[in-house]
Amino acid sequence: MGEFMNKKDMFVLGIETSCDETAAAIVKNGREIVANVVASQMESHQRFGGVVPEIASRHHVEQITLVLEETMKQANMDISQLDAIAVTEGPGLVGALLIGVNAAKALAFAHRIPLVGVHHIAGHIYANQLVQEMKFPLLALVVSGGHTELIYMKEHGIFEVIGETRDDAAGEAYDKVARALQLPYPGGPHIDRLAKQGKPIIDLPRAWLEEGSYDFSFSGLKSAVINTLHNAKQRGEMIRPEDMAASFQASVVEVLVRKTIEAAMHYSVKQILLAGGVAANEGLRTQLQKQMDQLPEVELVIPPLSLCTDNAAMIAAAGTVLFQQGKRATMALNANPSLLL
């Protein structure tokens, strides 16, 4: 314990319960993970083909105390040694968020520790800070189940959304296409795996939208996949699921990557960060790395898989920055399911 308990060090506890992961973590100086615990509920939601909010909330209630205890044990620390507690206040499922927010408030109140509210997407972006120091100005491509956004940052804590989805998020489209292909939930990893065995030979649309727009649209693509499968079935034709997965993924990835590269050029950024659950997608990671040749001056940062999906280390990392900027939450902090960045 002694060797890393230098009092100049700052220890922040992060708590994340926005969807179907109950997570807590302790991060040192905003960069170094001391403890990181995630209890996933994926199996409970699998048979429903999506996250059931009521079930998610019940699981969070069951898990939160255990997860917090395990985190303190992993870190070999006492709560009194924490400098701050950071918690996801939104966006997400209101019942799920409430569990984390109330746990954080209870700990902060009982132990007189400063409390910081964190935006879930800011957390995903700051997961990269655990890998590499952020260099501004930067561009973050955030791709998850509920979000697909291009975010420009010229300094810490300032987020400018320069592009977002106009309908389905990429992760949502993956889940719906996976269902059409009779693949299990969540769809992303299954399509990613299947795509490697197929060829992108099916002609599917790519929504570029109007000139100069960094927005995304995936509902037309999703409908095209469903219609193509339906029409083939009507005609008694067989479409290889591998080829459909490869074709769908090629369409999504091409749009995501091209718009990211164009925005990075336009905004003259020093870094591109990949963030969110779909950032774990191998097709996306590979294509983005390939296209970086066009931007020799720009550094690409991709977090390890464990930091792409929901976790609390990213919330602690983002919370550290907010805490250092003097941001504090009061005991009136509440879950905000539609919180804007």
Swiss-Prot record:
Sequence positions that bind Fe cation: H120, H124, D310
Cross-referenced CDD domains: ASKHA_NBD_TsaD_bac
Compartments where located: Cytoplasm
A single cellular component GO annotation: cytoplasm
GO molecular function: iron ion binding; N(6)-L-threonylcarbamoyladenine synthase activity
Presence of the UniProt keyword Acyltransferase in the record: yes
The protein's Enzyme Commission number: 2.3.1.234
Function as written in the Swiss-Prot or TrEMBL entry: Required for the formation of a threonylcarbamoyl group on adenosine at position 37 (t(6)A37) in tRNAs that read codons beginning with adenine. Is involved in the transfer of the threonylcarbamoyl moiety of threonylcarbamoyl-AMP (TC-AMP) to the N6 group of A37, together with TsaE and TsaB. TsaD likely plays a direct catalytic role in this reaction.
Protein name in the entry: tRNA N6-adenosine threonylcarbamoyltransferase
Protein species of origin: Anoxybacillus flavithermus (strain DSM 21510 / WK1)
Source taxonomy: Bacteria, Bacillati, Bacillota, Bacilli, Bacillales
